């Protein structure tokens, strides 16, 4: 069993990255405009659910927000490791 995310949401991205097998996601929406791809995912991990919004430009996430049911919103500006989750999820969907 993977480690649960604390109710404060602290370290959520790091915990998910260490336990990717317990991290699940479903693509809800994908759009493309001017060469940029926008994705909206429903995400599930152990004790929490949420959404992941990603805007990709040239294969790199330029805007991203992980909104967890714990009341925590994680963005690229407050956790640079979110980029790793974005790349992981988008690569899996496009594989």
Label each PLM-derived region with a short phrase:
Residues 20, 26-30, 55-58, 69-71, ...:
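Low-complexity, intrinsically disordered/propeptide-like segments
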Residues 2-12, 64-95:
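Mixed-charge, Lys/Arg-enriched low-complexity segments
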Residues 20, 24, 48, 92-93:
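Short, flexible helical or helix-coil boundary motifs
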Residues 31-73:
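Acidic, low-complexity, intrinsically disordered interaction modules
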Residues 1-43:
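Negatively charged, low-complexity tracts enriched in Asp/Glu with abundant Ser/Thr
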């Amino acid at each position: 069993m993977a480690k649960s995310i604390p109710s404060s949401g602290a370290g959520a991205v790091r915990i998910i990255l260490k336990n990717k097998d317990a991290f699940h996601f479903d693509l809800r929406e994908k759009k493309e405009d001017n060469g940029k791809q926008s994705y909206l995912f429903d995400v599930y991990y152990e004790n929490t659910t949420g959404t992941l919004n990603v805007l990709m430009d040239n294969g790199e996430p330029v805007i991203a927000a992980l909104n967890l049911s714990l009341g925590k919103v994680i963005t690229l500006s407050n956790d640079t490791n979110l980029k790793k989750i974005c790349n992981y999820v988008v690569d899996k969907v496009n594989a």
